[in-house]
Amino acid sequence: MHARCTQFLVLVGIMALAACADRPDPARIGAPSFAVGGVGRPTVLVNPKANDNGTAKTIQEGIDMVASGGQVLVTPGTYDEAIVIDKGLALEAIAGESEPVIVAPSGSVNAAIRVATPDAVLIRGLTVHYTGVRGIFGDGAVDVTIERSAVVAVNPPLGGSTLISILHDAPTTGRGHLVVSGSVLDGNLPFEDSPTPPFPQLFGITVAGDVDARLEGNVIRRTGGACVFVRPRLDLGGETNADILGNDLDECYPIGRAGSILVGPAAPLPSPRPPFTATGVVNVVGNTIRNSTHSCLASSAINYESFGGRIERNRVLGVVQPCALASGRVVPAGIWVGSLRGLPAAAPITVRFNDIEGNAQAGLRVASNMTTSIDASCNWWGSASGPSGAGPGSGDAVVVEAGAATPAFLPFALAQIAGTDATSCE
């Protein structure tokens, strides 16, 4: 109960996004002096309580009125509308107000906020409550930045869905771009310990295809899929790059037992299977990943099947339980590297300066296709004696699947290291 209350207070604190100050009456907030009449204005105010004709009464009306590259400022309140952003703009909650701006479309929606433009879109300070497939969604070569916002699922449906997703699966020359920072994502699922009976496969953030992404400083809770999912195009080609930095992940209940952070192709793989030609760099750095409810569904904290990059300075704390089971894409481990599905080895990759502690079965496990030794030095394994398994100590185990090369885990850290600035452990 205490953990739930703390989580609620953190969620409310971030969603408020407001400083303590005297609050103006929203009914008295009118349009800026330059925004009288006409279409295509640089700044548009949204205030359903305003009486003048120059102020938009809905967010969609404000989007339609503003010029490309302009700013839509939204006064506090709950807006029952699904939004389509079809031009570059900044959509922002007005700072300094006492209540949040909540986008809460009634009924079930395909997307509460859909971005349908290649031009840069900024979403700042909004709260999204929705029932349906997606909270915030962009398809194709979109350019979306989401800052200090909150996305909360309400009665999510069975089947696949996601709180925030950018999908670019078409083999074109354009690229998608996504930044999500300082935001709170809540899948709103109760504790799950088994895929039976089925529950919503709700992902936190999905980055797919020809996309460059930066996901930094977010809090993600109570999902039914991976809290973060980065995958290549569905044809197993293209280039996908992502930096997953400094996020706080907990209560990720992947119904497919894949992982809290999942890096690799979607399941099932296409049939007939094309050659895997996807390239990209996916860095997983400075994240804290827990399983505070001790769910058996968390078979890994980081499941790194494809691409190359750095897995560094993460805190992987008590994620894998003794009851965790293998799936078609992972054998239980705090950090899993490689593929059970016949894909090329993830490379080049380093696993360094992590705190890997309290994970049953394995702290690090490498798949059979990882035939070249990876650098796994300077990790803290929960014991000053080092890792167990392939290692000499009693800490979380290093497990090497048949045919794989043993990771280079020496030297190892003698104390927790992820939160330090250490560049060596000798």
Briefly describe each language-model feature range.
Residues 57-66, 79-87, 91, 113-114, ...:
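Short, T/G/N/S-enriched strand-turn elements that build extracellular solenoid repeat scaffolds
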Residues 376-426:
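Extracellular/surface-exposed low-complexity segments
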Residues 104-114, 130-138, 157-175, 189-208, ...:
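Extracellular beta-strand/beta-solenoid scaffold signature
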Residues 89-135, 148, 155, 181-182, ...:
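Right-handed parallel beta-helix/beta-spiral solenoid domain characteristic of secreted/periplasmic
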Residues 42, 70, 81, 87-89, ...:
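The right-handed parallel beta-helix/beta-solenoid scaffold, focusing on the short coil/turn
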Residues 17-19:
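C-terminal motif of bacterial Sec signal peptides marking the signal peptidase cleavage site
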Residues 21-61, 65, 76-78, 90, ...:
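Right-handed parallel beta-helix/beta-solenoid
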